[in-house]
Amino acid sequence: MRILLLTPNSRVNRSGNRNTAERWAVLLCELGHDAEVRTRYEGQDADLLIALHGEKTQEGLMAFRSAHPDRPCIVALTGTDLYPLISATSLESLELADGVIVLQKKAIELIPDEFADKVTVVVQSVNLPQSRQGQNGASDHFEVCVVGHLREVKSPLLTARAARDLPVESSVRVRHAGGILEEQYREWVAAEEAINPRYEWLG
């Protein structure tokens, strides 16, 4: 099957949506399909469209549906589709979709009942590296990794600020990986690192 994965164009090379689309493409190819990732629908011939982010890929979804009304379309609702609220545009995309993917069970609670029969939960997976235990000795810290670009909609410093309230004997350290997409976070990250010994921004 020829599968087209449509992901939003992003200001950063490796957005969460792009990473998800690339990973799904690999998994689909491993299952014997021909899968490709694009940021625009430009008339590509495909048997199935998977559109990541119902709002940002709606134009491509509508164009594919118009060109191939008999071919299935799946909409994957990603983070900012759902939070803080589902937009009218995303709801229109759900109307067009034959199936809807969400990435965690709690997301189902945010989707109107009329679309419930379309929804499937696909829990994200990752290839784990070989264990590094013992290579550098035992750590004195319990490390929490936050992965996400810094922009307001994601509340990216929430974990760091929560870590400030931990008891002094706690061994928790917060390491944050993600690009700065809103410039004010450059100053806020520096300030957080200066006052919070538990927090480190990795870039």
What are these model-predicted stretches?
Residues 84-98:
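A conserved, positively charged/aromatic
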Residues 136-154, 159-166, 174-177:
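Conserved donor-binding/catalytic core segment of Leloir-type glycosyltransferases
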Residues 96-131:
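A short, active-site helix/loop in glycosyltransferases that binds the activated sugar's phosphate group
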Residues 39-59:
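Short N-terminal targeting/anchoring amphipathic segment
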Residues 85-86, 126-141, 183:
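Acidic anion/phosphate-binding donor-loop and adjacent secondary structure
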